């Protein structure tokens, strides 16, 4: 460990005492490891483990998927009621087949509404319908001839319900198959064997480098500067802080690689210093973890320098960490997401997964159906916060939360955004309970975490996304949120957490709109986009494809939109739950199966709509047409239910700017 002057002096002083080669160094030599085929053995073991790890990962994803499907199915039944479905799946069919039938049904419903089909076109449409019925009978057991004489919305609902059931059964089979395959493989033992083989190879290489009467040089302090190449040969790995990395050895010293950990907490200027002494760099960090702290005094100085020297925004030392800067300066730098998560209960970490990581994490822990894994407790309404301290929330923690926790006190943590609340909680609770701000909890974990938000109305400070991500992900087994019962802003992160908790705990929504059945409609969206790609010659489909691609690009480009997703062609009746705001004509229009939203951007955490987008063909939607009148109705309905709407014309421009 070098870096600071004190570290270097300590290294020199203790070098002779601590720098000892192993007494049995000769035993490190392994004749087998000298053989050319020995690395191939390691490669073979690695490939075997890769295969097992891949199956373990897929098993975790399947468990994650079936849990999401199960929760969504419960909400579907709560919001639409139970219904006997007479459709039965044939053994040779799959959930993908049912999605295709649903998609085709929707196309027929749209054509049916059109009065423009005449003569040969109408005849061809009838033939297509007959062929569809024949094909659907090969996929499903249709109960009777009257099945297809019903309203198309009822037929589609049957396909949706059968899809849920079929997909659930498919996932159960996949999980069972993977569990049986993995039961016959001892991954831990195979990993141990590979580690042993790799260690033999490493030790053998170290023996050839440092054994065989290799002189053990003892360096002086000036050697670190004047003889740095020899120091590097003897000590190929050097530890240092980013700030001191340049001065660990001579300033001209160059390293093959620099590995920078916790880069989200490194300042831009010190990170740049560290880069200047390496040929290659591996930057490790998480932009959704807490960034480095910059004091107000330093911010003022850094902003002055930035303005005076015309420093580009992507090098903003006052407001960005080194990791954020790297991502902006080199947006196409190769990135690897460490996807596997082993700490938290699935229901806890999946909030962070959906909110901050776009659903890309693979949750390797198991959900065994435990109760009260993630809970929110609202205090009574009122102004209970005083100077960043909230006694009412402390009382709730002491009297309602802690009695329900069965862990040892040293396995419980309380997180607060303000030091005054931390001090007050410490005074009220047992000494063994760890109470601190989020910054002091980063890198740690507890069986149970209690988060007190303090503010009567959530502020930008207590709602900071990085703070919330770290706070939630400290909890291994249970997480409690204690929050004011006052109405909170709907678009804040804490509100998303509350909505996530309520949804996953099966709370029945009292909203006038349905929660978004994203598992169902994400699958449908994939099927529809695949269908549209086969019909690019039809202009309306082409515009839908282009809009979908545009929306995907917008969401991918913005890190703050990771919690958003897109579904297409959502019927309005799947969105409107309470028709009391509508008149008779509007209700009839909203309930029509063909009244749909072209694209809906929704919050994958709260399952609530964020923005509706319509793609309007100029001729079809121009003023005075029947479609224009329907557009006015749809605009009014969405406005009544507080759902923002953007209309994009096929002859318009600046679509990306309009949507953002």
Residue ranges and their predicted role:
Residues 512-660:
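Nucleic-acid endo/exonuclease domains
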Residues 297-336, 458-558:
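Helicase C-terminal subdomain and adjacent C-terminal extension
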Residues 1-160:
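Long, amphipathic, heptad-repeat alpha-helical coiled-coil stalk/linker regions
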